Amino acid sequence: HAGQAGEVATDALRYVCDCNHYDAVKMAIFENLVIEGLGGAEIIVEKKGKYLDVVVKQTRWETVFWDGHSRRKDFKDANHMGHATWMYVEDIEVLYGEKAGKVAEDSLAGVGVGGLAWGSYDDRPTVGQWLDYKHKRVLVVDMYCKYKGRWTRSLFCNGGDLIEPMVSEYTDEFGEPVCPIELASVYVDRENARYGLVRGMIGPQDEIN
């Protein structure tokens, strides 16, 4: 029976990897590790009709953020991490409901919770930018944070929460909430900055310049 259970588990993992084109995802993450020094993925569950699918999504290095005090290469000492993504207001309503859509719409109308905002024409989040008036988009932050020792999730934009903050839906084998984002880095310097192999190829004089 133990052997059969092992085969079932192996088949299940192989199925998840095949559905997510895992080899391609791994290569993309590896490229981020080598060049930018940081790579990872978010392992989540998505409902598709009456089925639940395990989805492995690469976290783009330019959109992800983490606890600046984290020193471990696997980020296991981080107290928060997440990613910031530009989203159209209409897509927010489809994904998170009418109330969330209203919060995003209010952001563009100037009813936000604060912070600076400019009309952005860039698809990559920039410090200080929360709103893209031209394309009716808002910067959506999906953040997992340890609160009283438990991982919680918040999803918000400049206008406020898009969903109610909650304990993470994902748990470990002991039933404890976990963060579904897995990150890794190649090197960590004394200032906790992450970097990859490419930085070591830069000559001393070029680095000074």
Please state what every model-predicted region is.
Residues H1-N209:
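Extended alpha-helical, oligomerization-prone segments that build pores/tubes and scaffolds
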